[in-house]
Amino acid sequence: TLFRSQTREEVASQKAELEEKQSQQQTLLYDQQAQQEKLEQARNERKKTLAGLESSIQAGQSQLSEMRANESRLRNSIARAEAAAKARAEKEAREAQAVRNKQQEASRKGTTYKPTENERSLMSRTGGLGSPRGQAYWPVRGTILHRYGEQLQGELRWKGIVIGASEGSEVKAIADGRVILADWLQGYGLVVVVEHGKGDMSLYGYNQSALVSVGTQVRAGQPIALVGSSGGQGRPSLYFEIRRQGQAVNPQPWLGR
């Protein structure tokens, strides 16, 4: 009877031990399944992230290509405008030189030659912007949002400055000159370009409207456009460049008045 009792106890103990092992194995199986599900979820998340990155890279490259194309169109438009205005610019440069010759001749004779108002205007608008020393007007009063040389996208950098201003504010010519371009350009909106002589020009983009047309003579501080957001930017602002011999240069050293 004692033997039979021990055997029953052993059987019960073994059964309990077996059930415990089965329970542990079941728990382990559940844990493995849960871990597998987590791994699968992590893999799917990683795939989504990689797909998103790939899409973002492609979108960035597409945007970069578009910006390069916009910049190329701007250069080509300016070159065409310069070519169209070349004959007049050369004629005015010769006339301005003739006035300077008169002044020099008078000086040699110990007298002075006083240019007429038209001659003074001619010399001013064909004499270039000179060395940058803060002598030019600010094109608009506002907050500088982007500076020359800052990163625009990828390897592209800002070729000018962006000034945030109230919509409809007057955009003013920074110096005397003649308008050679007033047109819509992709990426820059409504653009006005003023030629100042000697290869210098100023460019005003993102405008709501232009107050001048090609061929208009402008004076320093004269309103030439109204601030807008035609370049596709989120807020009203002015895109402003100075170009010297076709190359964009930092405009800020010229601006002071």
Residue ranges and their predicted role:
Residues 130-257:
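Catalytic cores of peptidoglycan-degrading enzymes
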Residues 1-122:
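Alpha-helical oligomerization segments with coiled-coil/rod-like character
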Residues 94, 126-131:
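Intrinsically disordered, low-complexity Ser/Thr-rich linker and spacer segments
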